[in-house]
A protein has these predicted regions:
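C-terminal cap/linker of serine protease catalytic domains
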Residues: 28-54, 208-252
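Active-site substrate-binding loop(s) of clan PA
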Residues: 44-45, 52-53, 79-80, 84-86, ...
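N-terminal Sec-pathway targeting helices
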Residues: 2-17
Length: 252
C-alpha cells in the first residue's frame, strides 16, 4: 500500500511540475521586461507604474499663455529642461515649448506667463527660438525639476505618453504608440488638441523623445518634433549623420 501511495505522489509531481514552471515563467517574464532600462529592448510595453510616470512628468510641465496687448492670446504647454547656460538667478528654470505658441509675443515685452496645474500664472521670459523647427526656449521664476532626454531613438510601436493642456484642461494625459518617424519628426497615435502644443512626448522611462507640435483632424495620427531638431538652435549635439547634427547616435 505504501509503495502504491509513493507511486501516486510521484505521478502527481510529474503532472504538477510543468504547470508550476509555466506559472513561474509567466510571472518572471514581465518583470524582466521592466527591469531593462534600455527602451530599445522594452520600449513597446507601458511602464510598470503609469501613475508615477504621470505624476513625475506633471511636476515638470506648465501651461503657457502668450497675451500680447490688443491681440488674440494663445495657449500651449511647456516642460522643464536642463540648460544651465540659459538659466539665471531670477529665472532658474528653463522651458521648451513650440514657436507657434509664443510667436505673437515676440518683441512685445513681458506678455508670456506660465503656471503649474491649478496654480496662479507667473512671469516667463523668451530666451530664443527656432521658427523652422517650431521650437522656443523660455525661462521662468518657478523652480521645476527638469525632464530627462532619452538616449534612444524611437521605433514604430513604441509606447509613448503626451502631457499638456488639451483645450485648456491642464495636466491632460494621452497614451499612444509611435507609428513611424524620420530624422526630425515622430508620428504618434496619441490624441492631442489645441493647447497640447509644446508638451513633452515621453517614453516608458519618462524621458523626452520629442515635443508635441501638430495634429490632423482628418487623420488618425499626430506629430511631434524629435530631439534631433533641437540640434539646430537649442542643444549642442555631438553626433552627426550626412552632415547634419543629431541628438541620437545612428552609427552604434
Amino acid at each position: 500500500m505504501k509503495q502504491e501511495t509513493n507511486k501516486f505522489i510521484a505521478y502527481l509531481a510529474i503532472i504538477a511540475t510543468p504547470f508550476a514552471l509555466g506559472a513561474f515563467f509567466l510571472a518572471w517574464s514581465p518583470a524582466q521586461q521592466f527591469s531593462n532600462e534600455d527602451p530599445s529592448s522594452d520600449g513597446y510595453v507601458p511602464p510598470r507604474s503609469i501613475e508615477r510616470l504621470v505624476e513625475r512628468t506633471q511636476e515638470s510641465t506648465v501651461t503657457v499663455w502668450c497675451e500680447p496687448k490688443g491681440e488674440k492670446f494663445s495657449q500651449g504647454t511647456a516642460w522643464a529642461i536642463e540648460l544651465e547656460k540659459d538659466a539665471t538667478k531670477e529665472f532658474p528654470t528653463v522651458l521648451i515649448t513650440n514657436h507657434h505658441v509664443i510667436d505673437t509675443c515676440i518683441g512685445k515685452g513681458d506678455v508670456i506667463t506660465v503656471a503649474l496645474p491649478f496654480e496662479d500664472p507667473v512671469a516667463a521670459e523668451l530666451v530664443r527660438w527656432d521658427a523652422e523647427n517650431d521650437l522656443a526656449v523660455l525661462r521662468t521664476t518657478l523652480k521645476l525639476p527638469a525632464l530627462g532626454l532619452s538616449e534612444y531613438d524611437t521605433y514604430p510601436g513604441y509606447w509613448v505618453m503626451a502631457l499638456g493642456s488639451a483645450d485648456g484642461y491642464e495636466g491632460s494625459v494621452a497614451f499612444g504608440n509611435v507609428i513611424n518617424s524620420n530624422r526630425t519628426e515622430i508620428l504618434v497615435t496619441n490624441n492631442i488638441s489645441s493647447g497640447s502644443s509644446g508638451g513633452a512626448l515621453v517614453d516608458n522611462e519618462g524621458n523626452v523623445v520629442g515635443v508635441m507640435t501638430w495634429s490632423l483632424d482628418e487623420q488618425q495620427y499626430n506629430g511631434a518634433v524629435s530631439l534631433n531638431a533641437f540640434c539646430v538652435k537649442i542643444l549642442e549635439c555631438k553626433y552627426e549623420i550626412k552632415g547634419e547634427k543629431t541628438w541620437w547616435d545612428y552609427e552604434e
